[in-house]
A protein has these predicted regions:
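Conserved adenylation A10 loop of the ANL superfamily
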Residues: 1
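Conserved A3 ("GATE") glycine/threonine-rich loop of ANL adenylate-forming enzymes
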Residues: 82, 136-144, 157-169
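Extended hydrophobic secondary-structure segments that form protein cores and membrane-embedded regions
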Residues: 26-30, 132-134
Length: 169
């Protein structure tokens, strides 16, 4: 049994680190509510700030998720790494692996301009209106994580377990 104080602690932490989220916030709920991670950060936290939660009514395939993100334009995205990796692979990876782009990403000054453009494309792919993508529930691909770090993509990888309601870090 998860104690109330553990749930409350997670909610207080989320309010502290994401003060910009409020009753105007939109969230697409794509994780199973039967799991603590989805229940906490796509439902309970949002209820305490009065946010608008948009539940997917179909199995969350990449196509359905992308349609929902484009339509809702969420202010925060809560996901497992696999979802984020699939979006990266379908929207960005082909661009980054082109020979000319690979070469230009090694040229000082030009690399920053290209990284900024790529980051903008990735942000647009996720609806273009979010403050952060928060991932947890599984390991995040190290190569993609390094790439996200390099382009200054706004993301956080959390660690937790259900017994901790669910976040630890």
């Amino acid at each position: 049994m998860i104690p109330y104080r553990a749930l409350c602690s997670n909610i207080q932490f989320a309010k502290h680190v994401l003060p910009e989220l409020n009753n105007q916030t939109n969230v697409v709920a794509m994780l199973p509510s039967a799991h603590m991670y989805g229940m906490m950060f796509e439902f309970l936290f949002e209820m305490t700030i009065g946010a608008h939660v948009h539940f997917l009514t179909r199995v969350p395939s990449p196509k359905i998720i992308m349609q929902a993100l484009a339509e809702v334009k969420p202010n925060i995205i809560i996901a497992v790494p696999l979802i984020i990796e699939k979006v990266y692979k379908s929207k960005i990876q082909k661009i980054v692996e082109k020979g000319s782009v690979k070469t230009l990403l090694k040229v000082p000054v030009i690399d920053k301009m290209i990284q900024k453009k790529i980051c903008g494309e990735l942000v647009s792919a996720f609806g273009g209106n979010f403050v952060e993508v928060i991932m947890g529930g599984a390991a995040f691909n190290k190569e993609i994580e390094k790439f996200f770090w390099d382009i200054a993509f706004p993301y956080t990888v959390g660690y937790g377990m259900t017994e901790c309601a669910p976040i630890i870090t």
